[in-house]
Amino acid sequence: MKQLFFFFLVFPFVVWSQSDFEKGEKLFGEAKFKQAQVLFESYLKSNSNHIKTIEYLGDTASHNSSWENAVFYYRKLKDLKPNEANYYYKYGGALGMKATQVNKFRALGMIGEIRGSFEKAIVLNPKHIEARWALVMYYIQLPGIIGGSEAKAIKYSNELLKLSPIDGYLSKGQIFEYFKKYALAEEQYKKAIAAGSTKKGTQLLANLQKNKLKKTSDDSISDFVDNIIKK
Protein backbone atom coordinates (compact mmCIF):
# COMPACT_ATOMS: atom_id res chain seq x y z
CA MET A 1 0.00 0.00 0.00
CA LYS A 2 2.88 2.33 0.84
CA GLN A 3 4.48 1.58 -2.54
CA LEU A 4 1.22 2.43 -4.29
CA PHE A 5 0.97 5.68 -2.34
CA PHE A 6 4.58 6.54 -3.28
CA PHE A 7 3.82 5.85 -6.95
CA PHE A 8 0.86 8.25 -6.96
CA LEU A 9 2.94 10.82 -5.12
CA VAL A 10 5.82 10.68 -7.59
CA PHE A 11 3.91 10.02 -10.83
CA PRO A 12 2.54 13.60 -11.28
CA PHE A 13 6.08 14.97 -10.90
CA VAL A 14 7.40 12.57 -13.56
CA VAL A 15 4.65 13.58 -15.97
CA TRP A 16 5.30 17.25 -15.25
CA SER A 17 9.07 16.90 -15.73
CA GLN A 18 8.57 15.23 -19.10
CA SER A 19 5.87 17.58 -20.33
CA ASP A 20 8.22 20.45 -21.26
CA PHE A 21 10.19 18.14 -23.54
CA GLU A 22 7.08 16.62 -25.09
CA LYS A 23 5.43 20.00 -25.59
CA GLY A 24 8.68 21.29 -27.05
CA GLU A 25 8.76 18.39 -29.52
CA LYS A 26 5.20 19.13 -30.59
CA LEU A 27 5.93 22.83 -31.09
CA PHE A 28 9.11 21.98 -32.99
CA GLY A 29 7.10 19.72 -35.30
CA GLU A 30 4.76 22.66 -35.91
CA ALA A 31 7.75 24.90 -36.79
CA LYS A 32 7.14 27.09 -33.72
CA PHE A 33 10.82 27.16 -32.97
CA LYS A 34 11.06 30.08 -30.54
CA GLN A 35 8.28 28.68 -28.38
CA ALA A 36 9.87 25.24 -28.50
CA GLN A 37 13.22 26.70 -27.47
CA VAL A 38 11.79 28.07 -24.20
CA LEU A 39 10.44 24.65 -23.23
CA PHE A 40 13.61 22.79 -24.18
CA GLU A 41 15.70 25.25 -22.16
CA SER A 42 13.42 24.68 -19.18
CA TYR A 43 13.75 20.90 -19.50
CA LEU A 44 17.53 21.08 -19.86
CA LYS A 45 17.86 22.84 -16.49
CA SER A 46 17.00 19.63 -14.68
CA ASN A 47 18.35 17.27 -17.39
CA SER A 48 21.66 18.88 -18.28
CA ASN A 49 23.01 16.06 -20.46
CA HIS A 50 19.79 15.01 -22.19
CA ILE A 51 21.09 14.39 -25.71
CA LYS A 52 17.85 14.88 -27.62
CA THR A 53 17.04 18.13 -25.82
CA ILE A 54 20.49 19.52 -26.61
CA GLU A 55 20.06 18.52 -30.25
CA TYR A 56 16.65 20.18 -30.41
CA LEU A 57 18.14 23.35 -28.93
CA GLY A 58 20.85 23.31 -31.59
CA ASP A 59 18.21 22.76 -34.26
CA THR A 60 15.93 25.54 -32.96
CA ALA A 61 18.91 27.89 -32.86
CA SER A 62 19.69 26.96 -36.48
CA HIS A 63 16.10 27.57 -37.57
CA ASN A 64 16.25 30.95 -35.80
CA SER A 65 19.62 31.73 -37.49
CA SER A 66 21.22 32.03 -34.06
CA TRP A 67 24.46 30.43 -35.17
CA GLU A 68 26.46 31.22 -32.04
CA ASN A 69 23.96 29.25 -29.95
CA ALA A 70 23.75 26.47 -32.54
CA VAL A 71 27.54 26.05 -32.45
CA PHE A 72 27.41 25.93 -28.63
CA TYR A 73 24.83 23.14 -28.51
CA TYR A 74 26.29 21.08 -31.36
CA ARG A 75 29.75 21.31 -29.80
CA LYS A 76 28.27 20.01 -26.56
CA LEU A 77 26.66 17.14 -28.48
CA LYS A 78 29.87 16.01 -30.14
CA ASP A 79 31.70 16.26 -26.81
CA LEU A 80 29.07 14.06 -25.15
CA LYS A 81 28.90 11.59 -28.06
CA PRO A 82 32.21 11.84 -29.96
CA ASN A 83 31.40 8.88 -32.21
CA GLU A 84 28.15 10.27 -33.62
CA ALA A 85 28.79 11.43 -37.21
CA ASN A 86 25.70 13.60 -37.52
CA TYR A 87 26.75 15.83 -34.62
CA TYR A 88 30.01 16.68 -36.38
CA TYR A 89 28.06 17.41 -39.56
CA LYS A 90 25.66 19.74 -37.74
CA TYR A 91 28.51 21.41 -35.88
CA GLY A 92 30.42 22.03 -39.11
CA GLY A 93 27.32 23.45 -40.78
CA ALA A 94 26.55 25.82 -37.90
CA LEU A 95 30.19 26.89 -37.72
CA GLY A 96 30.14 27.57 -41.46
CA MET A 97 27.08 29.80 -41.10
CA LYS A 98 28.66 31.58 -38.14
CA ALA A 99 31.72 32.25 -40.32
CA THR A 100 29.52 34.26 -42.70
CA GLN A 101 28.60 36.62 -39.85
CA VAL A 102 32.05 37.44 -38.48
CA ASN A 103 34.91 39.46 -39.94
CA LYS A 104 37.10 37.89 -42.61
CA PHE A 105 40.07 37.30 -40.31
CA ARG A 106 37.97 35.34 -37.80
CA ALA A 107 36.30 33.44 -40.63
CA LEU A 108 39.68 32.39 -42.03
CA GLY A 109 40.59 30.92 -38.67
CA MET A 110 37.43 28.79 -38.71
CA ILE A 111 37.88 27.25 -42.16
CA GLY A 112 39.97 24.29 -41.06
CA GLU A 113 37.58 23.32 -38.27
CA ILE A 114 34.59 23.54 -40.62
CA ARG A 115 36.20 21.24 -43.19
CA GLY A 116 37.54 18.95 -40.48
CA SER A 117 34.07 18.52 -38.96
CA PHE A 118 32.59 17.35 -42.26
CA GLU A 119 35.55 15.04 -42.87
CA LYS A 120 35.19 13.58 -39.36
CA ALA A 121 31.50 12.89 -40.04
CA ILE A 122 32.51 10.85 -43.10
CA VAL A 123 35.16 8.94 -41.15
CA LEU A 124 32.56 8.01 -38.53
CA ASN A 125 29.91 7.24 -41.14
CA PRO A 126 31.39 6.42 -44.56
CA LYS A 127 27.92 6.62 -46.12
CA HIS A 128 27.14 10.12 -44.82
CA ILE A 129 25.60 11.87 -47.83
CA GLU A 130 24.96 15.31 -46.29
CA ALA A 131 28.59 15.73 -45.15
CA ARG A 132 29.78 15.06 -48.71
CA TRP A 133 27.29 17.60 -50.05
CA ALA A 134 28.65 20.10 -47.52
CA LEU A 135 32.21 19.47 -48.72
CA VAL A 136 31.16 19.88 -52.36
CA MET A 137 29.70 23.31 -51.52
CA TYR A 138 32.68 24.14 -49.31
CA TYR A 139 35.20 23.54 -52.09
CA ILE A 140 33.30 25.37 -54.84
CA GLN A 141 32.43 28.44 -52.76
CA LEU A 142 35.80 28.91 -51.11
CA PRO A 143 38.30 30.99 -53.15
CA GLY A 144 41.14 28.90 -54.55
CA ILE A 145 43.75 30.94 -52.71
CA ILE A 146 42.44 29.68 -49.36
CA GLY A 147 41.61 26.12 -50.31
CA GLY A 148 38.76 26.14 -52.81
CA SER A 149 39.08 23.46 -55.47
CA GLU A 150 36.89 22.26 -58.32
CA ALA A 151 38.83 18.99 -58.41
CA LYS A 152 38.19 18.26 -54.72
CA ALA A 153 34.52 19.15 -55.12
CA ILE A 154 34.28 16.65 -58.00
CA LYS A 155 36.02 14.03 -55.84
CA TYR A 156 33.22 14.22 -53.25
CA SER A 157 30.61 14.40 -56.00
CA ASN A 158 31.97 11.13 -57.42
CA GLU A 159 31.70 9.58 -53.96
CA LEU A 160 28.09 10.77 -53.80
CA LEU A 161 27.43 9.16 -57.18
CA LYS A 162 28.42 5.78 -55.76
CA LEU A 163 26.20 6.20 -52.69
CA SER A 164 23.25 7.88 -54.40
CA PRO A 165 23.18 8.47 -58.19
CA ILE A 166 20.68 11.32 -57.84
CA ASP A 167 22.88 13.18 -55.34
CA GLY A 168 25.90 12.51 -57.53
CA TYR A 169 24.28 14.01 -60.62
CA LEU A 170 22.80 16.98 -58.75
CA SER A 171 26.05 17.81 -56.97
CA LYS A 172 28.06 17.59 -60.18
CA GLY A 173 25.49 19.82 -61.86
CA GLN A 174 25.97 22.37 -59.08
CA ILE A 175 29.74 22.26 -59.54
CA PHE A 176 29.55 22.76 -63.31
CA GLU A 177 26.97 25.53 -62.95
CA TYR A 178 29.10 27.35 -60.38
CA PHE A 179 32.07 27.29 -62.74
CA LYS A 180 29.81 28.38 -65.64
CA LYS A 181 30.06 25.10 -67.54
CA TYR A 182 26.38 25.33 -68.35
CA ALA A 183 26.11 22.59 -70.97
CA LEU A 184 27.73 20.07 -68.63
CA ALA A 185 25.52 21.23 -65.75
CA GLU A 186 22.39 20.81 -67.87
CA GLU A 187 23.48 17.28 -68.79
CA GLN A 188 23.89 16.34 -65.11
CA TYR A 189 20.51 17.79 -64.10
CA LYS A 190 18.82 15.83 -66.89
CA LYS A 191 20.53 12.66 -65.64
CA ALA A 192 19.23 13.39 -62.14
CA ILE A 193 15.69 13.81 -63.48
CA ALA A 194 15.96 10.54 -65.41
CA ALA A 195 17.18 8.83 -62.23
CA GLY A 196 14.09 9.97 -60.34
CA SER A 197 14.80 13.47 -58.99
CA THR A 198 11.86 15.03 -60.79
CA LYS A 199 11.23 17.90 -58.37
CA LYS A 200 14.74 19.02 -57.37
CA GLY A 201 16.31 18.20 -60.73
CA THR A 202 13.59 20.03 -62.67
CA GLN A 203 13.90 23.04 -60.38
CA LEU A 204 17.67 23.26 -60.78
CA LEU A 205 17.40 22.77 -64.55
CA ALA A 206 14.79 25.53 -64.80
CA ASN A 207 16.95 27.88 -62.71
CA LEU A 208 19.96 27.07 -64.89
CA GLN A 209 18.06 27.83 -68.10
CA LYS A 210 16.70 31.03 -66.58
CA ASN A 211 20.20 32.14 -65.58
CA LYS A 212 21.53 31.28 -69.04
CA LEU A 213 18.83 33.41 -70.66
CA LYS A 214 19.62 36.28 -68.30
CA LYS A 215 23.33 35.96 -69.06
CA THR A 216 22.63 35.93 -72.80
CA SER A 217 20.46 39.02 -72.40
CA ASP A 218 23.12 40.78 -70.30
CA ASP A 219 25.82 39.88 -72.84
CA SER A 220 23.66 41.22 -75.69
CA ILE A 221 23.15 44.52 -73.85
CA SER A 222 26.87 44.70 -73.10
CA ASP A 223 27.73 44.04 -76.78
CA PHE A 224 25.23 46.70 -77.85
CA VAL A 225 26.78 49.27 -75.49
CA ASP A 226 30.29 48.32 -76.65
CA ASN A 227 29.27 48.83 -80.28
CA ILE A 228 27.86 52.26 -79.46
CA ILE A 229 31.04 53.24 -77.64
CA LYS A 230 33.20 52.02 -80.53
CA LYS A 231 31.20 54.12 -82.94
PLM segments and residue spans:
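Residue-level recognition of tetratricopeptide repeat
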Residues: 50, 84, 128, 165-167, ...
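Canonical tetratricopeptide repeat
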Residues: 52, 56-59, 90-91, 134, ...
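Structural marker of alpha-solenoid helical repeat scaffolds
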Residues: 46, 80, 124, 160-163, ...
